[in-house]
Regions:
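Bateman/CBS regulatory modules and CBS-like beta-alpha motifs in cytosolic regions of diverse proteins
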Residues: 27-51, 58-60, 89-129, 134-137, ...
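Surface-exposed amphipathic alpha-helices with a cationic face
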Residues: 44-48, 73, 98, 121-125, ...
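Catalytic beta/alpha-barrel core
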Residues: 80-85, 109-111, 131-135, 176-178, ...
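Glycine-rich phosphate-binding active-site loops on the catalytic face of alpha/beta enzymes
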Residues: 74-89, 256-268, 308-326, 362-396
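Short beta-strand/loop segments at the ligand-binding rim of alpha/beta enzyme cores
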Residues: 48-57, 103-108, 171, 228-237, ...
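Alpha/beta catalytic cores of nucleotide-metabolism and tRNA/nucleoside-modifying enzymes
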Residues: 1-21, 109-112, 177-178, 184-188, ...
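Active-site-adjacent beta->alpha loops and helix N-cap segments on the catalytic face
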Residues: 85-95, 141, 156-161, 206-226, ...
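Catalytic cores of alpha/beta
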Residues: 67-70, 244-254, 288, 293-312, ...
Length: 501
């Protein structure tokens, strides 16, 4: 006989946080939102990767491209570049993020003295970088012979056939720094010499990296930005359970920091096989998350398979209709609470903490705080990020209001059957997502800043200043439908919508 859960499953809007004691030290500016992204052992000082804010962007065509990945990394979160595209184009997006940043940057634009002005212009048009390294062999780590920047040429007064050697700034006129130079020292050299870029070279004068003035300004404006050991932005990527043996190597070559198996249902043999292949091929050096699941059995299955984090949620996304078309899923709050308990039990038994990601069901900003209090280490958001300037879809006018297009990976538009296919030879013939619009909301920075201020403020109401304390000390109450109505405005007439004449 089928098992019946004794209680209905619930979602975030059915819960409220009960205030706790707020001390003088508990103010929003002192709240830390740092949280682990990947698993770690008890007693280990730091996970291999942590987030500075508990936000990640969904593995979706209409959400996570390289532009949004850069913007979110500046805030301290991470994007997972969508996998429903060719291996080459996904790897190219990852590479753009890794080359964009900051600190010590491997040169992405390189030529030889024998190249021409036309080559310089073509390279600039291709990758958007205005600084070109001139090396003996035209590679990023060749012997440095000069630099070409936009100040070195005027298209209107030169011929496309002019050789680079005739207008580049030669090596003897360049200020450089040795390999052991720290980022602070490099920035000091840049400011003292009024430079826009500083080449870092080895003992044989081969180019190693550039340090750019603009990146110093960016870091000062974004103190929580998420960087790797080379001061490049962190970026993730979604994979499927079919072409992973060719997709993963290409993504790693492009510099990806973390992977996630993108699937509507993660409690499957195919996810286990994918994780096992990663562990056999790369050991623990490659970080890979898995999901989605909605109960303790699904979590333990993926944790024991070797997942670095586990995503929680089926059918709760605003564009997801998996529950409607297939009748599977669970209320997001109930699923999250159960999986969080399973994660804590697994940690007690094995000494390994496997972070969980709440994926779906976030409608209002306060839902973020509820999800974290219920045990989520971080959140994955689709609709939320799809509204911003940096997202991949255009801003359009619909019925007098600016909107952005937003569609699910299970929709006909995405046709990402590898995400929803259970592994058989026959492709699915129905949709599990819709094609829609979301209200345009402006730049990512302004919106994330406002949302996280609400999270920090609410945490202070609870009486905590970090996420682990929130998960330990928060008190939550299930509310009735009448209480939900009571929580909004009621028994009044709004002046803005019903002006008094």
């Amino acid at each position: 006989m089928a098992y019946y859960y004794p209680e209905p499953s619930h979602t975030f809007s059915e819960y409220l946080l009960v205030p706790g004691y707020t001390s003088e030290e508990c103010i929003p500016d002192k709240v830390s939102l740092k949280t682990p992204l990947v698993k770690f052992r008890k007693g280990q000082e730091e996970p291999a990767i942590s987030l500075n804010i508990p936000l990640t962007s969904a593995v979706m065509q209409s959400v996570s491209n390289d532009t949004l990945a850069i913007a979110l990394a500046k805030e301290g979160g991470i994007s997972f570049i969508f996998g429903s595209q060719s291996i080459e184009s996904q790897a190219a997006m990852v590479a753009k993020v890794k080359h964009h940043k900051a600190g010590f940057v491997t040169s992405a634009s390189n030529l030889t003295p024998e190249n021409t002005l036309a080559d310089v212009l073509a390279l600039k048009a291709k990758n958007g970088f205005s600084t070109v390294a001139i090396t003996h062999d035209g590679t990023a780590n060749g012997k440095l012979l000069g630099i070409v920047s936009s100040r070195d040429y005027r298209v209107s007064r030169m011929e496309p056939t002019d050789k680079v050697s005739s207008f580049m700034t030669p090596r003897e006129k360049l200020v450089t720094a040795p390999a052991e130079t720290t980022l602070k020292e490099a920035n000091d050299i840049i400011w003292e010499n009024k430079l826009n870029s500083l080449p870092i070279v080895d003992e044989n004068d081969h180019l190693l990296y550039f340090v750019f003035r603009k990146d110093y300004s960016s870091h000062k404006a974004n103190p929580l930005e998420l960087l790797d050991s080379q001061k490049r932005y962190l970026v993730g990527a979604g994979i499927n359970t079919r072409d992973y043996e060719t997709r993963i190597p290409a993504l790693l070559e492009a510099g990806v920091d973390v992977l996630v198996i993108d699937s509507s249902e993660g409690y499957t043999c195919w996810q286990k096989k994918t994780i096992e292949w990663v562990r056999k091929t790369y050991g623990d050096t490659v970080k890979i998350g898995a999901g989605n699941v909605v109960d303790r059995d699904g979590f333990r299955f993926l944790a024991e398979a070797g997942a670095d984090f586990v995503k929680v949620g089926i059918g709760g996304g605003s564009i997801c209709i998996t529950r409607e078309t297939k009748g599977i899923g669970r209320g997001q709050a109930t699923a999250l609470i159960e999986v969080a308990a399973a994660r804590d039990q697994y940690f007690q038994e094995n000494g390994v903490y496997v972070p969980i990601c709440s994926d779906g069901g976030i409608v209002h900003d306060y839902h973020m705080t509820l999800a974290l209090a219920m045990g989520a280490d971080f959140l994955m958001l689709g609709r939320y990020f799809a509204r911003f300037d940096e997202g991949p879809t255009p801003k359009i006018m619909v019925n007098g209001a600016y909107m952005k297009e937003y569609w699910g990976e299970g929709s006909n538009r995405a046709r990402n059957w590898q995400r929803y296919d259970l592994g058989g030879a026959t492709k699915l013939s129905f949709e599990e997502g819709v094609d829609s619009y979301v209200t345009y909301a402006g730049p990512l920075h302004d919106n994330v800043e406002a949302s996280l201020y609400k999270v920090r403020s609410t945490m202070c109401n609870v009486g905590v200043t970090n996420i682990p304390d929130l998960q330990r000390d928060a008190k939550l109450t299930l509310v009735s439908s009448v209480s939900i109505v009571e929580g909004g405005y009621h028994d009044v007439t709004l002046r803005s919508s019903n002006p008094v004449k």
